[in-house]
Design a protein with these regions (language model features):
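Alpha-helical support elements that line or immediately flank enzyme active sites
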Residues: 305-311
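Short, small/polar-rich motifs associated with maturation and membrane association
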Residues: 1-222, 227-240, 304
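Proline-rich low-complexity regions
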Residues: 51, 67-68, 261-265, 313
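Short, intrinsically disordered, charge-balanced linker/junction segments flanking boundaries
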Residues: 314-319
Length: 319
């Protein structure tokens, strides 16, 4: 369940046990549909795209509309937020009203998402693994002409066309039969009376509807807490790192358009020169198998280190 408290505005807090279950590969997917007024969307079929989040709608036509992200008290961005493993999140707190976001100034104009990650517990040790597997397929395709149907139609309409002697369904050639989705997370935590430690490793794989399109995200997280001087001093240290490797299609929309409009008499193999034949009679249409071969690899790595010291002077008074 999500809890709400009303002061001068509204605060929605979604705990770990209330987040979406199943094949969830990002914090945005875990949050989707859990808080009223928060809109989460993602481009379908593209595994490399990151979900967008709108907490207070579109507040700017020229500036950014992403909410301010705060992870364990440290300012972050949507890239780092989407890199977090869902299993490493303890809770998400969403601040929507201007009265609640005013403390963050203009940075909180589009709303604020406060992320609290999982930590080790005093006097408690555990080892856990969580994994999900899923598949995705193209639900429905256009019914394309075969090569013989294409020839007959072109002749009956008196159209000029190139006959390359093949019979290719280019949609079938560029699409995967089955795309895999995987999410793996393993964590270890240990605690004594005065200290705690938690370490985790995560891996996410998302394969798209198109061949040669996928995203792999590797994460590592380490958090430690130490109490000193009869617990009057609390020291916290956290390290989070991620690396995202993406194979991005050069132009997904052009590829689908070309696959549906390309001359099916063209073969699905290269010519003697090792090149893909192009239909010179086609307008704004390219051989989709040639487009599929264009490499567009993207790698993004980030590291976040944060620390905190809390002094408990007397009961109820901390600095």
């Amino acid at each position: 369940r999500s809890s709400k408290r009303t002061v001068s505005g509204a605060v929605d807090r979604v705990k770990k046990e209330d987040m979406n279950k199943g094949v969830v590969t990002s914090p945005a997917e875990a949050l989707k549909g859990k808080v009223a007024g928060v809109i989460i969307s993602q481009a379908g079929g593209d595994p490399t795209s990151s979900p967008s989040i709108r907490v207070r709608g579109t507040s700017s036509l020229s500036g950014g509309n992403d909410p301010l992200i705060i992870i364990d008290g440290v300012f972050a961005d949507m890239t780092m937020f989407n890199s977090l493993a869902p299993g490493d999140i303890e809770s998400l707190t969403i601040l929507k009203d201007a009265s609640e976001t005013a403390q963050y100034g203009s940075r909180g104009a589009s709303g604020v998402i406060v992320v609290t990650t999982a930590k080790g517990k005093l006097g408690y040790s555990s080892l856990s693994y969580n994994g999900q597997f899923g598949v995705n397929t193209v639900y429905k395709n256009l019914d394309l002409m075969s090569a013989s149907e294409y020839r007959e139609t072109a002749k009956s309409l008196g159209l000029t066309y190139t006959d390359m002697g093949g019979d290719t369904n280019f949609l079938d050639e560029i699409e995967r039969n089955v795309g895999l989705t995987q999410n793996h997370n393993i964590s270890f935590s240990s605690g004594t009376d005065t200290s705690s430690l938690r370490a985790s490793l995560g891996f996410v794989l998302r394969q798209g509807a198109l061949k040669n399109s996928d995203m792999k995200n590797f994460t590592a997280k380490l958090d430690g807490t130490q109490y000193l001087f009869d617990k009057h001093l609390k020291l916290e240290l956290g390290i989070f790192g991620s690396q995202r490797n993406s194979n991005i299609q050069y132009d997904m929309h052009k590829m689908f358009y070309s696959a549906t409009a390309y001359n099916p008499t063209y073969p699905n193999v290269r010519n003697d020169k090792g090149e893909w034949d192009e239909d010179l009679l086609a307008n704004e249409v390219w051989n989709p198998l040639g487009l599929l071969d264009i490499d567009d690899f993207y790698k993004d790595a980030s590291v976040n280190v944060h620390g905190k010291a809390t002094v408990n002077i007397i009961d109820g008074l901390t600095v």
